Amino acid sequence: TVKNVTGQELNQSMTDILRGFNRLMKYKKVDKNLIGFLRATEVTYSKELDSYHPHLHVLLMVRPSYFQAKADYINQEEWTELWQKAMKLDYTPMVDIRAVKADKGKGLKGAILETAKYPVKPFDVTDKKTDFTDQEKLQIVDDMLTGLHRKRQIGFGKLFKEIKKQFDFDDLEDGNLVQTGEDTEGTSSGREIVAVWNWDRKNYFVR
């Protein structure tokens, strides 16, 4: 994450974050272990601070050796340092990275789906629990639409690009981060994706 910003600063902050993320993925120690990634944007609003908190949720697929080789593994502190470097920050940002673990009864697939749902949850300004005035709602929607203008909300990298090609995931990239209460509620069907490790080619392939 980065520090909170005003509505006027949101668009530039999002540009900086996406550029910083691209730099992070190209760092040698990150790139050599990376099989694929899913990057999603989330922006939350603080009424108390009257500011926005732009941040990324990222799902990384790494090589099997990542957790076994000391030279390859990147701990929490090092991820924080790499993100600070990529963003060119003069303060220590907050980075929370965790291994996806299988939940009892759900399996690894369930753990991945559980992790992946957070990046794409919408920010609902019409929720009565938010207690926003009508003027505040209008301002928040305007700030969010302006701040996220021409910003890709979800990005796929490496193996996940192949997954996107083989399955109809274009609607994810065109999703809405701001809910105004006018959308009808519906259900979505899930897809099971199997990536097989090829030892000869040292890479994953979608089956």
Regions found by a protein language model. Give the residues of each.
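Right-hand nucleic-acid polymerase module
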Residues: 1-52, 62-207
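Cys/His-coordinated zinc-finger cores
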Residues: 58
